[in-house]
From Swiss-Prot:
Taxonomy of the source species: Bacteria, Bacillati, Bacillota, Bacilli, Bacillales
Cysteine-cysteine disulfides: none
Record organism: Staphylococcus aureus (strain COL)
Quaternary context: Toxicity requires sequential binding and synergistic association of a class S and a class F component which form heterooligomeric complexes. HlgC (class S) associates with HlgB (class F) thus forming an CB toxin.
Full protein name: Gamma-hemolysin component C
One Gene Ontology biological process: cytolysis in another organism
Amino acid sequence: MLKNKILTTTLSVSLLAPLANPLLENAKAANDTEDIGKGSDIEIIKRTEDKTSNKWGVTQNIQFDFVKDKKYNKDALILKMQGFISSRTTYYNYKKTNHVKAMRWPFQYNIGLKTNDKYVSLINYLPKNKIESTNVSQILGYNIGGNFQSAPSLGGNGSFNYSKSISYTQQNYVSEVEQQNSKSVLWGVKANSFATESGQKSAFDSDLFVGYKPHSKDPRDYFVPDSELPPLVQSGFNPSFIATVSHEKGSSDTSEFEITYGRNMDVTHAIKRSTHYGNSYLDGHRVHNAFVNRNYTVKYEVNWKTHEIKVKGQN
């Protein structure tokens, strides 16, 4: 369902406000306009768009925060990309064989933003660098005059006129920026390593997730139970990413942005084999990136004057 949430409330904030409380931020997200600074130097105008694709198993929840700063010679927009990407993990018989079962699972989740507008530039984004921690929390702050800065965590020291936080969980996965330039940024949240009953295993281990029941007819039984699968494999991923862009004032009234959520899928085969003595066991075989860029892309049109958001297309 498409939701276009229009703003109704006006708040006043002191010239140097402390870092925002993330719980309050999430509660009021996209439901207000904030006048920040003495004499209303900055106005934050908020919009939210929700788009869901059952075909791709993806929901995009995008917050658009327009920064109207009298002391900054450009328009600025903070895009917070949230929602859900289903894992789409499935189990099946490989080519109708009786002795080979397959598990298709997400090795990588993809999150990206792109624009082709010559008057728009990417100026900041979160997260940056490679992050291996299970819980990711960072802040993007804004100070009067067009100064965007990031803080390492929700407990970071410092003050901003306005701030936006990200927070997500990536157990057994790592986040890193795969591509970035003045018009786009692409993140990959990739499988890393897993604690199993037989010890720590790399995400590339051929026996990863292979189970212990070679005599079952159910493909699911050839692999470890749900209790041994991390959330990003069993159910899916809740992204929380930020990109900030600038726009040349007086140039174009509208700009288009493509936001992409998706996954790259690996396939693990569990093959029933027998020893010289007739005992059965399961042997793993891996196909890395068997299905790549299984992505849902939505094209949003941003109006810099009216602050309206329109959905212009989707795949």
